[in-house]
Amino acid sequence: IFLTSFAGRDDAGTVFKGAVQFNAGNFSLIKPGAYFYRYPHQLGLLSFERLILYLIPLPVISVFYVLNLGMVIGMNYATWKITDELFTKPLVSRLSVIMSFGFLPLVFNIMFAYGLMYGLFFSSFAILFFLRYLRRGKVRNAILSVVMLSLAYWVRSNNIILIIALSGILILMTLREKRYRYLLLVLAFFAFPMSLHKATTSYYEITTHQKISGTPQIAWLAMGLQDKPDSKRMPGWYTGYVRDIYAKKKGNIEKIEKSANHLFDRRVQYLLAHPDEASWFFSTKFISSWTEGSFQSIWNGPSKDKFQPLWNRFATSIYHDGTLHLFFVTYMQGYLLVLYLGGAFYYAFTYKRMGDGATLGLYAFLYLFGGILFHLISETKSQYTLPYIYLQIPMIAAGYNHMTQILSRYLKNMQKSS
């Protein structure tokens, strides 16, 4: 945090700039054609940062870097307690703590003042209180879970996938236990986050005396199916299409939607008619999204391409492709393989041995499955996949604990036979 004067860039920088300006009474960034007018899904994140700046009236983005640091510690604490609730095995819980803090993309994302980090923090505690409610039945835990889930969706709308995953567990519990009160919690999981989102948009519409429609969602789906040969990015990654089509159609929502629908339909028809190319496109998109171990966490910080200032050689070596950059990227790539190995072992061999914890822990599998489907269709980046992997850590820890037990028994049998 203190090794650079990094002021943020791109979406994160614009949201912070908007929070400072809005708190000062300047609403220029929500005028027709401006950033928040085009992307009203960011209004929850904007409002969260405005609230923080009300409480800490320092118009510097490092306030959020410090907040991110606290959130990383908080979400790792939540992961520890989630593991306790699921498996009640001290060794598994301790291993999950070690694995959480060994997950360095969170550390580097401290410099990423954006909804991904805030959303993951709130999601972690939403899951913790959700599990406590199912284990102990206290209404207070259900309320806290709804509050945290609402905040998670408020700052990052992609967390609708987590809402669906947790609701899936509640529906499963309803069918198994015939406790229909769980369905009330399902209703609350959808009603409160959606209401908060709607209320936020309505507030800004009333404040600015205008209807804020935003860029149609189909534009992101159309972008997610693009494969530009001249692009530096992988197939299905962000291309700037959403921004470009808005400018090209001069903000005409009907024309934007019509053009995006046409592009989407044309691309779908092409992929259906060329199955080999479709297979290459989606496999490349999947692999590039889910096998990049840094999750763009270093790239999210002070970028060499953007000439952002760094104050010493240590930070420069990390962020400007030096020796430390190579070291950390290699470490994170290897660590991702370790996580995948543990996860595969858990779902293949450990899951059936974990009793009720396995059933409750299915939220992580449903969340991961939903994330894979969503980002296969919509726009993707490797940074988007981070939450889906991080929330698997309790299961990965259980997988490695089971793997260690099997290996220990095998070695003992070998010693006896020798």
Residue ranges and their predicted role:
Residues T79-G102, G357-L362:
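Transmembrane-helix signature of polytopic, membrane-embedded enzymes
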Residues S62-V63, N68, T284-L368:
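Membrane-interface anchor segments at the N-terminal boundary of transmembrane helices
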Residues F64-M71, I98-F125, F130, V139, ...:
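Multi-pass, polyprenyl lipid-linked donor-dependent membrane glycosyltransferases
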Residues Y204-F307:
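Membrane-proximal stem/loop segments at transmembrane-domain junctions that anchor or position
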Residues L29-I30, G44-L67, F87-P90, P105, ...:
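Juxtamembrane segments of multi-pass membrane glycosylation machinery
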Residues V66-F87, F125, G342-Y346:
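Transmembrane-helix motifs of polytopic, lipid-linked glycan transferases
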Residues T4-V20, A24-L51, L55-P59, I256-A260, ...:
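Extracytoplasmic catalytic/substrate-binding loops of multi-pass membrane glycan-assembly enzymes
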Residues N141-R156, L166-G168, L185-P193:
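Membrane-interface alpha helices of multi-pass inner-membrane proteins
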